[in-house]
Amino acid sequence: MLNRVRRTKIVATLGPSTDKANNLEKIILSGANVLRLNFSHGSSEEHKKRAKKAKEIMFKLNCHIALLGDLQGPKIRISKFKKNSIFLKVNDVFILDANLNEKNGNNERVGIDYKKLPNDLNVNDILLLDDGRIQLKVIKIEKCAIFTKVIIGGILSNNKGINKLGGGLSADALTEKDKKDIILASEIDVDYLAVSFPRCADDLIKARELLKKSGSNAQIIAKIERAEAVFDQNAIENIILSSDAIMIARGDLGVEIGDAELVGIQKKLIRTARKLNKVAITATQMMESMILNPLPTRAEVMDVANAVLDGSDAVMLSAETASGKYPSETVISMAKVCKGAEKVPSINVSRHRLNVEFQSIEEAIAMSSMYAANHLKGITAIITMTESGKTALMTSRITSGLPIFALSKHKKTLNLTALYRGVIPIYFDSDKDGVEAANEAIILLCKKKFLFNNDLVIVTQGDIMGKIGKTNTSRILRVTY
């Protein structure tokens, strides 16, 4: 029987730290399952080099890891100050001026990069700058100038972000830079593309259309960052159904809805994504102290563990691996926490979709197989022989504590399944069909020391290998050799 394998996946962001020495290979060997290219930072050439190097390492290590391109989106920012920063006191009047030159900010006013901001605001609106560290109340709007009173002061430096409490800013989800980066993502051949600040399903549909037009079939991740996206259950479901996965980007989302609300929203988003057969990534400041320190705080350990207990498919590292001093150590620490949390019995039981009508034969096979896995004593693994990865995804929506092996001859499919909770991608190419192919798959997994004599496994497959959407069979087989 296979020893316990970590089920929750780890997304690691690439950057200057992973460019050094052999740090990129180290984070892969330490347990990174998805490599994120953050298009908010770095040049297109840097991203191309990182993607090329990552693929070379994957080939060398014979492993399957997903590449994720992350669009910057319409991050609304102040411009620059003459002296780089100012100090705002409580009750000061401070002006955000759309007409002010980019580098002429002073103690009284600063420019803004989103010129339509005055049109989106009303008197008494609260603006949150620098992730909420500075708070301003709108007291007057005159043409292009927003007059505010400082509620919470402090140091304000160049190019800090602006959010509106409760959301409602109308900036388009896809900027001109994003459209260029979609082409870059296609050239790099990413497996996933994350769309920042989508307000509704239409933003994601447009991104998918542009991606396909550029020649890519990458899957779309909706980054949940705006208050509008979580306004009610209907808004949440519309966003999730229009994407292939969601990323709970807790930084901007927490600023817009408040940290206290964020706790319940995180759980609701993960629960809804799983219910709708979608993938959920929990992100932002998960082990931020490890940017400078070799060990996480206990609060960070609990945060990661709770994301695992909530049912996240993956937990994400940002600056910790991109620019931190301890990139591989951070991945190792996160992996340990995930495995620890996964020992909790309550997360290995699921009633997912037991009371709903299945939408396809594939889903019926996947759900019945997982029901059998959870109720037949002695099952040690699930094997899904898959062309597109869809059956592997659906089986991974039910929590069982058992490893799910996704076997495919398509490397793109294997890369996609690297993000799914509990799924282990394995390259497999057979000219056999039916039980002969199933037995070949078992032999391969035995050779790789994943299965052992007398193990009991469930195999899902189609009658004919090599056809997408044809999974119609589930077998329970005993390993004998």
Swiss-Prot record:
Protein name: Pyruvate kinase
Cofactor(s) named in the record: Mg(2+); K(+)
Catalytic activity entry: pyruvate + ATP = phosphoenolpyruvate + ADP + H(+)
EC number, UniProt record: 2.7.1.40
Family note: Belongs to the pyruvate kinase family.
Pathway given in the UniProt record: Carbohydrate degradation; glycolysis; pyruvate from D-glyceraldehyde 3-phosphate: step 5/5
Keyword vocabulary terms for this entry: Allosteric enzyme, ATP-binding, Glycolysis, Kinase, Magnesium, Metal-binding, Nucleotide-binding, Potassium, Pyruvate, Transferase
Broad enzyme group: transferase
Classification via Pfam families: PK, PK_C
Binding, substrate: R36, G251, D252, T284
Subunit architecture: Homotetramer.
